[in-house]
C-alpha cells in the first residue's frame, strides 16, 4: 500500500495494470493536493478485485489510520499525549479513582510529550484531571466517529468491475 502523487486529474479507482500478470491497482482517498497534483492511496493485487476485496483493503486502511490518529493525534496544553491502549487504561483508572475518592487519590502525574522531550504534568485537583480526561475521551470519540463517517461515505458501487 502506498500513497501516489500524479498530475492526472481523473484517477481510475480500479485498473488492470498488467493483463499478462493479472495485476490490478485498487485506489482510494483521491484528493486534489494543489494545482495539477492529485494524490491517492493504492494497493496492487494479483487478481481482479471483488467489491469485498476492495472493502477489506480500504476499511483496514481506515482502521489503521484511525488507530494512529487516536494514538498520536492529541495534544494537551501543547504537548503530545501518547494514547497507547495501556495509557488509555491508565488515564481512565486515574480519573475514575480521583472521582470515586472525591480527589483524595490526587495528585496524579502523567508523562506527556515524547521520550526525547518528556513533560511531566501533575493534576492536583479534580477539575484538572477531569479536563484532561475529557480531552482524551473527546479525542478518542471524535476520531472514531470520523473513521466511521469516512467508511459510510464510500460508494462501493464505484468499485464494481465489469
How would you describe each model-predicted region?
Residues 2-162:
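A preference for well-ordered globular domain cores
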Amino acid at each position: 500500500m502506498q500513497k501516489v502523487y500524479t498530475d492526472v486529474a481523473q484517477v481510475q479507482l480500479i485498473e488492470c495494470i498488467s493483463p499478462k500478470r493479472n495485476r490490478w491497482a485498487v485506489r482510494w482517498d483521491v484528493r486534489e493536493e494543489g494545482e495539477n497534483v492529485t494524490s491517492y492511496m493504492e494497493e496492487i493485487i494479483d487478481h481482479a478485485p471483488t467489491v469485498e476485496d476492495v472493502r477489506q483493503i480500504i476499511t483496514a486502511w481506515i482502521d489503521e489510520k484511525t488507530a494512529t490518529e487516536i494514538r498520536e493525534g492529541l495534544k494537551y496544553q501543547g504537548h503530545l499525549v501518547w494514547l497507547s491502549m495501556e495509557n488509555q487504561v491508565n488515564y481512565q483508572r486515574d480519573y475514575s479513582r480521583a472521582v470515586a475518592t472525591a480527589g483524595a487519590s490526587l495528585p496524579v502525574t502523567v508523562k506527556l510529550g515524547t521520550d526525547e522531550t518528556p513533560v511531566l504534568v501533575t493534576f492536583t485537583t479534580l477539575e484538572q484531571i477531569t479536563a484532561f480526561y475529557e480531552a482524551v475521551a473527546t479525542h478518542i470519540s471524535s476520531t472514531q466517529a470520523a473513521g466511521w463517517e469516512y467508511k459510510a461515505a464510500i460508494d462501493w458501487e464505484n468499485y464494481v468491475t465489469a
